[in-house]
């Protein structure tokens, strides 16, 4: 099956300035949102208590809040989830609760009395502030190392500079680990390490690695910005989605890189712009078909998968769309 007919000759390189403007606009919007609103951290990263309840009949959020007053949870927010007829609610409290023996029974009794209907506590999750801080750090490290090692692999795979790539990997990981021992701000450290990594790729003329890491950073940055713009929580499921997107986007990037390398050998007299256009056009149908299949799957997950998987699905919807675009233009 071909969506794009063979022989298509779209001048992607000629349209690159429009793509630069579009990408810069999306990245800027996301950064402004993060600065103005800040990331909305979920229980996993901010710490606190997450409780999911189900009522036998419809109850008001005010009634649930009244029932929570008798339980030591501090300030809490109540949100109805799922269909209205499901009568399911999610309670988020900033204070970690003592979820030991008797807490669930006390909570259930208090909510049932306040609501005037039987309330079942379906799950209780508690994360302490220190654990949340540790999880934030580990999530940032996971994203950083995924980006760097994938870019280094691409360099070794396409430029056959395995020794240079290996030494570079050791230097980057060793430096980041050493500096982290001095209690440096983790976000600042990761940002600085990424800038240094890109500069090193540039200095060592690792063109494929440079292209890979810029493309992946582009996808991750825009996806994070979209999550902030639409007020989604940053949680472990979002980190899983971002790591999945990094691998997914790289898969398409490798296909295009491989075709570029082949066309350089086949058409040595063509300039690089013509080779890139030819390579992207030749892989365009495959790129769109592959990503469209995955995109339709996560759209279904978003609408039919329920509240728990919705944040993950939204990140994948945005990320796959942007990843398809970056495979072609970035």
Model-based region annotation:
Residues 1-330:
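A structural signal for conserved, well-ordered secondary-structure elements
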């Amino acid at each position: 099956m071909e969506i794009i007919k063979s022989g298509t000759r779209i001048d992607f390189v000629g349209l690159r300035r429009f793509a630069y403007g579009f990408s810069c606009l999306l990245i800027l919007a996301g950064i402004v949102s993060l600065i103005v609103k800040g990331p909305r951290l979920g229980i996993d990263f901010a710490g606190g208590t997450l409780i999911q309840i189900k009522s036998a009949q419809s109850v008001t959020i005010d009634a649930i809040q009244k029932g929570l007053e008798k339980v030591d949870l501090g300030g809490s927010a109540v949100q109805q989830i799922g269909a209205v007829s499901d009568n399911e609610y999610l309670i988020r409290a900033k204070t970690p609760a003592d979820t030991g023996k008797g807490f669930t029974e006390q909570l259930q009794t208090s909510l049932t009395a306040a609501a005037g209907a039987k309330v079942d506590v379906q799950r209780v999750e508690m994360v302490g502030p220190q654990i949340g801080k540790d999880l934030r750090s580990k999530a940032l490290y996971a994203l950083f190392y995924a980006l760097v090692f994938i870019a280094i692999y691409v360099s070794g795979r396409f430029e056959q500079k395995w020794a240079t790539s290996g030494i570079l990997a050791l230097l980057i990981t060793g430096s980041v680990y050493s500096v982290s021992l001095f209690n440096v701000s983790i976000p600042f450290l990761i940002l600085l390490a990424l800038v240094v990594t890109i500069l090193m790729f540039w200095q060592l003329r690792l063109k494929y690695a440079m292209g890979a890491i810029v493309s992946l950073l582009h996808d991750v940055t825009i996806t994070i910005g979209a999550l902030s713009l639409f007020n989604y929580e940053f949680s472990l499921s979002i980190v899983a989605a971002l790591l999945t997107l990094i691998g997914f986007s790289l898969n398409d990037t490798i296909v295009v890189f491989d075709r570029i390398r082949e066309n350089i050998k086949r058409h040595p007299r063509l300039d690089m712009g013509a080779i890139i256009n030819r390579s992207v056009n030749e892989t365009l149908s495959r790129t769109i078909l592959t990503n469209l299949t995955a995109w339709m799957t996560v759209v279904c997950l978003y609408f039919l998968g329920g509240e728990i998987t919705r944040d993950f699905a939204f990140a994948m919807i945005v990320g796959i769309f942007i990843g398809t675009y970056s495979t072609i233009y970035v």
